[in-house]
Design a protein with these regions (language model features):
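Bacterial signal peptide processing site
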Residues: 26-28
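Conserved catalytic scaffold of divalent metal-dependent phosphoesterases
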Residues: 59, 128-136, 149-151, 246-325, ...
């Protein structure tokens, strides 16, 4: 069934396509030193009796062995001739590869084309080939992780433009070795697909302004079509599949993997959509995996060495800020983490528009999760109104930068518009008074909005002479240190769980400052679990606050007190 033959013309065409590729995408040398065409072997391939999708994976016409290929349900490997065979129902309408380490693919804009659409009916065999290109040395590489982008209108696009300019400048400067980008879901906002309209196509138009970067995507709850009755579909089939059709067409599979350097990156769809198809008020979701996706994870991991670190991207977190199960079902998160029990795994998520990190031990399995703050912060609201982009727990809007050195990874959260060593903000309680009469004076006495404000801001309400200082270290995790000294004497930071005062002032106060009788909160404040409290000896002493991350990077503030509290004071 297999015949080898020589084809010089096809080899020349491959090299010409590579040249075009090199001038139009990643600013990296790919397939350097390609020899003159000499008629490299190409393959005529016939489908196996049971195959409905088959083909080859090659590099400049030469077969690549051991590349994992999937249809979204099952995974197989190419043989010594670079051939794969899939007995697929073509349910996903896709076939895709797990890009092997050391290789890359052509992009369409910023979207790496590791996937292709099927074209023939389910029972009809079709050939789909993949061409890979050698990448630069990926041993040391950078993954830029973007949580909750939410592009949906003109103001969000304008704010996003500032970030895009920053990324283009930094990635072009060479300070990030071999950079890639991965989103963590909610790139768009399903309601505005119809209201603006602004959909995934428009989002891609903005992302394509990133220069020379490949952007891998994770699906979020707001990247589903809300006008599809996913609730009924899930109840009857165990799948929320149809609402993802637009996503798959534009961004590819919802569960996929790629090998970069010594790291196996995997993105999984942990969103169970329960939209009823009626629009905005009928939306809903929860965390979970379908049985199809569980099986895909098992099969993908079966081809991954136990010695290779795995980084898993998903939208909805495993844990909330205090380490409890985010889904509020005790231990339910283990239905996800147990799939990875034989691997050295780090989980990344988003969804909450807040930033925190968790490490747990469960029956001998170490589970670490980085919940990445939202690039859009509070849906770009505080950025547009006050010039300070804030997540709902007060962390700055920004993105995570993963640095991989061989099989070692580290990460730091970078606030947009700042340098990489911006780890905390400090607040002097003596200069704060969040009384409702000052912060939301329009709210009628005893109104719902005034009560709401009083509950959120009670720790900061009224004058204070207790010399308390609060320090929000948003990305605090294992291996980080916080030290505070007052006139050379060490103070003992105490961890507390509070609402961040800057977010209350920049977002919640404005919402509560309303005379409306029928009032409800829009974007809400969430608890900051990485807040620390120290008590100084006087109102005018100077504190030296120092935070050092696990890689030795340091942010130190000499806090001269009294320190003014105002939104303007904290603009990055």
């Amino acid at each position: 069934m297999l015949e080898l033959h020589r084809n010089t013309i096809q080899q020349i065409a491959a090299i010409l396509l590579t040249a075009i590729f090199l001038t139009g995408c990643k600013e990296k040398p790919l397939d350097e030193g390609v020899p003159e065409p000499d008629g490299a072997d190409t393959l005529i391939v016939c489908p196996a009796d049971s195959s409905t999708i088959y083909g080859t994976v090659t590099n400049l016409g030469k077969p690549l062995k051991g590349v994992v290929v999937s249809d979204g349900t099952m995974c197989v490997q190419t043989d010594t001739n670079g051939i794969y065979q899939l007995n697929s129902t073509k349910k996903h309408g896709l076939v895709y590869i797990s890009i092997p380490s050391g290789y890359t693919v052509r992009p369409a804009g910023t979207v790496p084309q590791f996937f292709k659409q099927t074209a023939k009916p389910a029972g009809e065999a079709e050939r789909i080939d993949f061409e890979l290109f050698k990448d630069v040395d990926q041993t040391n590489h950078t993954m830029i992780v973007l949580g909750d982008i939410h592009l949906f209108n003109e103001s969000s696009v304008k704010a996003f433009g500032t970030f895009r300019q920053e990324i283009n400048s930094l990635s072009g400067s060479g300070i990030w070795p071999c950079p890639y980008v991965m989103t963590m879901g909610d790139m768009s906002w399903d309601y505005y697909w119809y209201a603006t309209p602004f959909g995934l196509e428009d989002y891609l138009g903005q992302m394509n302004g990133l220069q020379g970067l490949h952007v891998f995507s994770t699906v979020g709850n707001h990247d589903h079509d809300m006008m599809i009755d996913s609730k009924t579909e899930y109840e009857t089939t165990g799948e929320d599949f149809t609402c993802q059709n637009s996503y798959r067409e534009l961004l590819g599979p919802t569960c996929w993997s790629v090998n970069i350097g010594g790291i196996h990156y995997m993105s999984i769809d942990d969103v169970i959509t329960t939209d009823d198809g009626t629009g905005k008020d009928g939306r809903g979701c929860r965390r979970g995996l379908t049985e199809n996706d569980r099986e895909w994870i098992r099969q993908d991991l079966s081809y991954v060495s136990k010695d290779m670190p795995v980084v898993v991207a998903m939208h909805i977190p495993l844990f909330n800020h205090n380490g409890n199960d985010y889904d509020k079902k005790l231990g339910e998160y283990t239905s996800i983490t147990s799939l990875f029990k034989d691997h050295d795994v780090t989980f990344m998520s988003a969804h909450t528009h807040s930033l925190y990190n968790t490490v747990k031990e469960d029956e001998g399995q170490r589970v670490e999760e980085w919940v990445t703050g939202a690039l859009c912060g509070d849906f770009w609201s505080s950025a547009n109104k006050h010039g300070v982009n804030l997540c709902t727990n007060g962390a700055p809007g920004g993105y995570r930068v993963i640095t991989a050195t061989g099989s070692h990874i580290s990460s730091v959260y970078k606030a947009t518009g700042t340098d990489g060593n911006f780890f905390f903000r400090s607040y002097d309680r003596n200069t704060m008074d969040f009384s409702a009469s000052l912060m939301c004076p329009k709210a009628p006495s005893g109104s719902k909005q005034q009560k709401f404000w009083n509950d959120k801001a009670k720790v900061y309400t009224g004058s204070s002479s207790e010399n308390i200082v609060y320090i929000h270290v948003w990305d605090m995790k294992e291996g980080w240190t916080l030290t505070v000294t007052e006139d050379g004497n060490a103070l003992d930071p105490v961890k507390v769980s509070l609402h961040d005062p800057l977010f209350l002032a920049a977002n919640i106060a404005g919402q509560c400052n309303s005379t409306r009788e029928e009032w409800s909160i829009g974007t809400n404040s969430t608890i900051c679990g990485q807040m620390y409290r120290v008590t100084a000896s006087s109102a005018g002493s100077t504190l030296v606050i120092s935070v050092t991350d696990s890689e030795g990077n340091n942010h130190t503030e000499t806090m001269k007190r009294p320190k003014e509290f105002s939104i303007k004071k904290y603009i990055n």
